[in-house]
């Protein structure tokens, strides 16, 4: 219970890693719902919880753009006019579902993390191979899914060993 000057507010903290935990929210109505990493949350949970709240706030890391959370929620939001230029045009083009009035989309990139010193930021960037899915998602902040080769630096001549070469070992 959070006590304000005028009234008490009840705060529920629920996990969504399994249905038994989040089903505790059923039957309730909530003023504000916060879902961290909505892109990995169970979609049944997201749908059920979202319909029970007045205000939904969610975070996510870029993921497979074909996940239902994008078509049902994220791509129905729009950036505020004064922040449109902050987002990559690639992502703005994906906000293609009919807009929901009042649904706002905010874009934050790796550069917005004020807790990182320039040195720490560079250390993290240098530890992620450029051209990989994780670089695109985590460093550039763009959506994407793994397709084709898992490692873009894969070289068949260098990384594939023939049976004959194995026998020689």
Residue ranges of model-derived segments:
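Inter-Walker segment of RecA-like/P-loop motor cores
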Residues: 1-31, 143
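Catalytic micro-motifs at enzyme active sites that drive phosphoryl/nucleotidyl and oxygen chemistry
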Residues: 21-23, 43-47, 161-163
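Short, well-ordered loop/turn elements at secondary-structure boundaries
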Residues: 28-29, 51-54, 167-169
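ASCE P-loop NTPase helicase motor core
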Residues: 40-126
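ATPase catalytic-site recognition across NTP-hydrolyzing enzymes
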Residues: 113-169
């Amino acid at each position: 219970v959070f006590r304000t000057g005028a009234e008490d507010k009840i705060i529920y903290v629920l996990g969504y890693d399994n249905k038994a935990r989040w089903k505790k929210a059923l039957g309730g109505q909530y003023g504000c719902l916060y879902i961290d990493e909505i892109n990995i949350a169970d979609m049944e949970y997201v749908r059920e919880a979202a319909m029970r709240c007045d205000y939904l706030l969610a975070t996510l890391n870029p993921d497979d753009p074909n996940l239902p959370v994008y078509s049902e929620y994220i791509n129905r939001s729009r950036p505020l006019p004064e922040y449109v230029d902050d987002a990559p045009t690639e992502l703005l083009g994906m906000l293609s579902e009919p807009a929901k009035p009042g649904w706002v989309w905010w874009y934050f990139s790796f550069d917005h993390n004020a807790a990182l010193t320039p040195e720490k930021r560079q250390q993290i960037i240098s530890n992620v191979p450029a051209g990989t899915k994780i670089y695109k998602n985590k460093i550039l902040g763009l959506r994407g899914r793994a397709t084709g080769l898992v490692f873009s630096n894969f070289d068949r001549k260098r990384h594939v060993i023939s049976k004959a070469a194995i026998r020689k070992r």
